[in-house]
């Protein structure tokens, strides 16, 4: 949801209000401080006092943890029912299929088995248009922000960009496809294994049919497993996404605490899994404001770069 506010000026629609619950302790705050961006400037309002006449579409983010804090398990159902009663459209980051069925006014990024292309005896399309991927060594590295920034830069230079995003907000930015492998993907992504590769390969082919000049794709979290004794850290979705999109070039997002060995391991994995080359590293955040001893003075931090393949 932060990316929508951070890049509000890049959206094709107007955000009229931003709502949250009082339990989040954000009501009354300015969004530009919450998302650290000057492009947004809304005062966050209490959703219990929502003005239904001020908008036509409700964008509903991931609110499961918020529901647990509120201990109001009917909150989502009641909010959706009230929105539909006021004839509002709903775009939800989470799948609402268990709450609302067959309502065209309710949309969420969900990939189902019926979305798979026809079976072609294991045959896949060959990529023709250049594909650039954004992958990472971990979470919270600004990978989606980087994708939106790249998209805007390329479009400003006259390139026609095709794009597959893995954040639910991808479609709101005008990206042609969303493949939700981030938070709550167990509910949004109902295909697995070879079917993921089939679906993504067909999606790349459909983007090529639009006569785009370049295709951007972006993954989630880390690319290789560093904790083999915990199932949660096995990057199955990311590996399938890599093989399904087969990028020609990759920009690798890294963190300040990544070791050179771990970065090299990630690069080797990416380049050996598909025929590609890691062409750049993107460091985020550049300044770490806290360490184990407390606050750090940014003026005393020096960021050095050593070429990994020297």
Segments predicted by a language model, with ranges:
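Long, basic/Gly/Ser/Thr-rich N-terminal segments
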Residues: 1-98, 300
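ATP-dependent carboxylate-amine ligase catalytic core
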Residues: 26-54, 153-238, 244, 258-264, ...
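Flexible, glycine/proline-enriched loop segments at strand-loop-helix junctions
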Residues: 68-70, 134-141, 187-191
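Extreme N-terminal, non-catalytic leader segments
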Residues: 76-131
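Walker A (P-loop) phosphate-binding motif
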Residues: 119-157
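G-domain G4 guanine-recognition motif of GTPases
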Residues: 137, 253-256, 281-294
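Conserved C-terminal guanine-recognition region of P-loop GTPase G domains, centered on the G4
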Residues: 262-273
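Conserved small/polar residues in nucleotide/adenosyl-binding loops
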Residues: 306-310
């Amino acid at each position: 949801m932060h990316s929508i506010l951070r890049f509000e000026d890049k959206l094709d629609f107007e955000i009229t209000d931003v709502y949250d619950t009082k339990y989040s302790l954000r009501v009354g705050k300015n969004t530009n401080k919450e998302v650290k961006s000057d492009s947004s400037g809304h005062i966050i309002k209490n959703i219990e006092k929502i003005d239904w006449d001020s908008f036509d579409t409700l964008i509903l983010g991931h609110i499961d943890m918020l529901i647990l804090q509120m201990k109001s398990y009917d909150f989502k159902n009641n909010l959706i029912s009230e929105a539909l009663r006021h004839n509002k459209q709903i775009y939800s980051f989470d799948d609402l299929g268990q709450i609302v069925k067959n309502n065209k006014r309710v949309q969420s990024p969900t990939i189902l088995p019926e979305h798979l292309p026809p079976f072609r005896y294991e045959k896949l399309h060959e990529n023709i248009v250049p594909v650039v991927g954004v992958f990472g060594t971990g979470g919270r590295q600004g990978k989606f922000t980087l994708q939106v920034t790249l998209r805007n830069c390329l479009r400003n230079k006259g390139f026609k960009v095709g794009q597959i995003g893995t954040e639910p907000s991808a479609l709101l930015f005008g990206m042609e496809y969303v493949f939700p492998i981030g938070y709550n993907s167990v509910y949004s992504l109902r295909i697995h294994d070879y079917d993921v590769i089939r679906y993504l390969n067909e999606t790349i082919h459909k983007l090529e049919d639009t006569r785009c000049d370049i295709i951007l794709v972006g993954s989630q979290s880390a690319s290789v497993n560093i904790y083999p004794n915990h199932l949660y850290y096995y990057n199955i979705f990311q590996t399938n996404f890599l093989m399904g999109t087969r990028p020609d070039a990759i920009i690798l997002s890294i963190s300040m605490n990544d070791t050179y060995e771990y970065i090299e391991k990630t690069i080797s994995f990416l380049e050996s899994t598909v025929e590609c080359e890691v062409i750049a590293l993107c460091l985020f955040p550049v300044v770490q404001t806290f360490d184990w001893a407390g606050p750090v003075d940014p003026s005393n931090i020096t960021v050095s770069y050593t070429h990994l393949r020297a």
